[in-house]
C-alpha cells in the first residue's frame, strides 16, 4: 500500500523550513509537558534522522534514561506529509496526519505521546 504524494506547490526549502518549525514546536510541547507533569525528570527531545531516502524519522529520546529512544513520527521528504509510525523502520501508510507546510506546521496533529490517531 502506498500513500500518494501530494504536490502542494511547496519547494524543498519550504518543506525543510516547515520540518524545522515542526520539530521546534514538538520540543516546546515536550518541555512544557515535562515541566508541569514530571518536574523531576529531564524532558524528552525530538531529533531528526536524515538516513532515509524517502522519509525523515523523528526520534524521541531521553538521554538521562540510558539513551531510551522511540520513533515519534515520520515526515515524507517529497511533500512534508506527517505520518504516524507503524514500527521503528516504517510509517503507517493509511493516511497523512497533516503537513509540515500547514499554517501551524502540522502541530495540531501532534501530542506529547505521538501523532494523533485518525478519527
Where are these regions (language model features)?
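Long, terminal "pre-/pro-" and other extracytoplasmic accessory regions
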Residues: 2-17, 87-93, 100, 118-119
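Short, non-transmembrane alpha-helical segments in secretory-pathway proteins
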Residues: 4-41
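Compositionally biased, low-complexity repeat tracts
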Residues: 14, 48, 63-66, 94, ...
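Exposed beta-strand-loop-beta-strand "reactive/processing" segments of non-cytosolic proteins
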Residues: 42-74
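Accessory DNA-engaging acidic/polar modules
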Residues: 51, 57, 100, 106-112, ...
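Small/flexible residues
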Residues: 59-64, 78, 86, 118
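Domain-scale terminal segments
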Residues: 76, 112-113
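A short, surface-exposed interaction/processing loop segment used at functional sites
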Residues: 79-108
Amino acid at each position: 500500500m502506498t500513500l500518494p504524494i501530494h504536490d502542494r506547490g511547496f519547494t524543498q526549502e519550504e518543506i525543510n523550513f516547515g520540518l524545522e518549525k515542526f520539530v521546534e514546536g514538538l520540543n516546546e510541547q515536550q518541555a512544557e509537558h515535562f515541566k508541569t507533569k514530571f518536574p523531576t525528570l529531564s524532558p524528552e527531545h525530538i531529533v531528526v534522522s536524515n538516513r532515509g531516502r524517502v522519509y525523515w524519522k523523528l526520534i524521541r529520546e531521553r538521554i538521562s534514561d540510558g539513551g531510551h529512544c522511540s520513533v515519534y513520527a515520520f515526515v515524507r521528504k517529497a511533500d512534508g506529509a506527517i505520518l504516524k509510525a507503524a514500527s521503528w523502520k516504517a510509517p503507517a501508510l493509511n493516511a497523512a496526519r497533516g503537513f509540515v507546510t500547514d499554517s501551524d506546521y502540522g502541530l495540531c496533529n501532534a501530542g506529547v505521546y505521538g501523532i494523533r490517531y485518525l478519527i
